Amino acid sequence: MPKKRSSPNRNVQIADQIQRDLSDLLREVKDPRIGIVTIQSVELTPDYAHAKVYFTTLTGDPQQTLEALTHAAGHLHNQLFKRLHIHTVPTLHFHYDKTIERAVEMSRLIDEANANRAKED
């Protein structure tokens, strides 16, 4: 008999719940390397074994924040286990989300191109 797959909506719901719970849990982490962190998104594997957690930070060095989050991953996993009502709580893999930085750079390049075009006209 084929294994029953969970629906894509359930995957999204669980990812959203993990995002909300991690945001709450990060407020309780006392590591000074973790400044103001925003969890941008969570992507789950279909079997819920792994979660890619994308974050941004307003303060501090993103690399130091990544190291601190990776160090705290075990604790965060245990706390998620207490909050989530699913059989498997995923292993957390943190990734710095560069989307905002890329958007700012693209905006700067567009502004620069428009300024150059205005000078030529």
UniProtKB/Swiss-Prot annotation:
Disulfide bridge partners, by residue number: none
Pfam families xref list: RBFA
UniProt keyword Cytoplasm present: yes
One Gene Ontology cellular component annotation held by this UniProt entry: cytosol
Gene3D superfamilies for the chain: 3.30.300.20
Origin superkingdom: Bacteria
Subcellular location: Cytoplasm
Subunit structure, interactors included: Monomer. Binds 30S ribosomal subunits, but not 50S ribosomal subunits or 70S ribosomes.
Task performed by this protein: One of several proteins that assist in the late maturation steps of the functional core of the 30S ribosomal subunit. Associates with free 30S ribosomal subunits (but not with 30S subunits that are part of 70S ribosomes or polysomes). Required for efficient processing of 16S rRNA. May interact with the 5'-terminal helix region of 16S rRNA.
Protein name: Ribosome-binding factor A
